[in-house]
Amino acid sequence: MTVHFPFQNSYVALPDNFFARVAPTPVAAPRLIKLNRPLAEELGLNPAELETPEGAEILAGKTVPEGAEPIAMAYAGHQFGHFVPQLGDGRAVLLGEVVDRNGVRRDIQLKGSGPTPFSRRGDGRAALGPVLREYIVSEAMAALGIPTTRSLAAVVTGEQVYRGTALPGAVLTRVATSHIRVGTFQYFAARQDVEAVRRLADHVIGRHYPDLAGTERPYHALLAAVISRQAKLIADWLLVGFIHGVMNTDNTSVSGETIDYGPCAFMDAYDPKQVFSSIDEFGRYAFANQPRIAMWNLTRLAECLLPLFGDDKDQAIKEAETALDGFAAQFTEAHQAGLRRKLGLFTQRDGDQPLAQALFDAMALAKADFTLTFRRLSDAAGSGDLSVVRALFEDPTGFDEWAARWQQRLAVEPQTPAERRAAMRKVNPAFIPRNHRIEAVITAAVENDDYAPFEELHAVLAKPYDDQPDRADYAEPPQPEERVLQTFCGT
């Protein structure tokens, strides 16, 4: 059977130094373990074709579909603050682009498809565990309503990869509105190739910000637009307790999507200094640091764009600084608006931010679970019964003091308790991809070739705001012996 991909490839029309043409490396015995049928249909693909052996071969990189022009993209990046002038797709191949049913151009990339000219002595492969982690978490983020790359398919290769021990190999088919990163701009800026920076900026404007084309100062507007999307994205992360774990500039998408999940994790007990990533030794990318790091990354983007702002360097710097100054205000506005919604506040008052901070302080002191605290507050807002929330706090004294202030604040809101409860439940999920659940899924798949736990967790996370009483245990935090203290990149 022929598997049809309606490719329309634009990135390969850019100069040859933007990428390396490279085909995926064939694998021994590809087997499809998960296809995202709704996403396939959204992309204009036929799920029935993709579920055939021929489809599995394409999704594993064993064969290249008609119309594909496989490439590895060039980029640089700051990794934990240290600049690396050449990174690039070291284990991923962009097959091409399709225009989805909403008219949006989307990349289709194979991750773990073999070595490329950018592999830096790596084998270009992916182990099954990291593939399942990214599939679960990226699709959970999409269900939560957070901009993200998507997962179209996961395939085991029939081969082993070696990461200290032998592990099953796998390939993830990742979908993104593009894979252009801050580090892509840095790649050309580091080479003082201003014309390439301009070509890339024009491409990004045409693809992601078409309203800016033809404006008087399109490159200034591009920087401002990327800043706005990143400010909103980071606010979204913090509102669900998400920790990216490796916020390097090469993992910062100019489209405003979450990308490169690696050692990501969701908080259980609230701790603003929480770090899970095993490689984040000094807490650079800790939960509460994420807005500051996003601002740092955007400053690196601004540096790349400065030559496009005009010949007066001092004036260009001032204009870039003005744009960057907008990040803090936009992040704060998005974050505080989100916190008001999470607390059931429909109007804005001066004391709202201190009220939210007081709850976080009480949660940190008493090690209360982040997700369950807000979910149970949603129900308490309807019933008035705070006991289910109190039970989450080792010492509820701080919570009791806060709850009295919260109830006073709710008293001046116009909504009924039932309206408030319904609104809060739409923004306070019951289910997140908890770390111990993900680890259990990976263990079952890697050790026993058992994907039933993966399927069940994925199904639960597809409806994060629903109660799902028959799956209530998935909402619970880990027992002490189940806690995951570190996550790993897997590369």
Swiss-Prot record:
Where is the sequence biased in composition, kind Basic and acidic residues?
466-484
Q: Does the keyword Hydrolase apply?
A: no
Q: Which UniProt keywords apply?
A: ATP-binding, Magnesium, Manganese, Metal-binding, Nucleotide-binding, Nucleotidyltransferase, Transferase
Enumerate the residues binding ATP.
Answer: 88, 90-91, 111, 123-124, 174, 181, 260
Catalytic activity from the UniProt record:
L-seryl-[protein] + ATP = 3-O-(5'-adenylyl)-L-seryl-[protein] + diphosphate; L-threonyl-[protein] + ATP = 3-O-(5'-adenylyl)-L-threonyl-[protein] + diphosphate; L-tyrosyl-[protein] + ATP = O-(5'-adenylyl)-L-tyrosyl-[protein] + diphosphate; L-histidyl-[protein] + UTP = N(tele)-(5'-uridylyl)-L-histidyl-[protein] + diphosphate
Q: What class of enzyme is it?
A: transferase
**Keyword check for Transferase:** yes
InterPro entries linked to this entry: SelO
One Pfam family name from the record?
SelO
Positions binding Mg(2+) in this chain are 251, 260
What is a GO molecular function of this protein? AMPylase activity
Q: What is its EC number?
A: 2.7.7.-, 2.7.7.108
Main function: Nucleotidyltransferase involved in the post-translational modification of proteins. It can catalyze the addition of adenosine monophosphate (AMP) or uridine monophosphate (UMP) to a protein, resulting in modifications known as AMPylation and UMPylation.
Q: Which family does it belong to?
A: Belongs to the SELO family.
What this protein is called in its record is Protein nucleotidyltransferase YdiU
Organism for this UniProt entry: Bradyrhizobium sp. (strain ORS 278)
